[in-house]
Amino acid sequence: MPEVIKNSENLLFINPEMVENIKEEARKSSSLIARLLMHLSHEDPVQEMLIAMCRGCAVAPNRALGRSESLQVVEGEIMLIMFDENGEVIQRVEMGSPGSDKAFLYRFTSTPWHTMVPLTEMVMVHETLQGPFVQSSETPPEWIPQDPTELKNLLNQAA
């Protein structure tokens, strides 16, 4: 389970020390992921997170039905992978931080099954989702492995 850091400030400034703390939490986490929830409540109409991911983490393909989503790479590089309903890869996009020669921002209006795989030792992304947060009742398709080792194998093959 990713390490979750909750914000309690109405006005939040992100500084280099905070970024390093989030990255350190990711390094210590068994999931190799840590996220700062920038919003105050799951009920907020906009959900924003600063997420640190170490190489080797496994983010299961997911989608947010009926909600828009955007993501900006702040540091490092990822492979964004999109899947069709049957688990076939339909698109791969290498993304990097601004100033790289890669795409650094995406926005989905209708969210497909997707995941990201870190291509560098550490990745920091800023994700924005339409709120409020509602835990999906959608059953993940059979092509998404529940076993962590099988999930990593799927992601390595897809990347």
Regions found by a protein language model. Give the residues of each.
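Amphipathic alpha-helical packing elements
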Residues: 49-53
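A short beta-loop-beta micro-motif enriched in histidine and acidic residues
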Residues: 38-47, 57-70, 101
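Short beta-strand His + acidic residue motifs that chelate non-heme Fe in jelly-roll/DSBH
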Residues: 60-62, 80-82, 106-108, 114-119, ...
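A short, N-terminal "cap"/entry segment at the start of jelly-roll beta-barrel domains
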Residues: 1-46, 91-98, 150-159
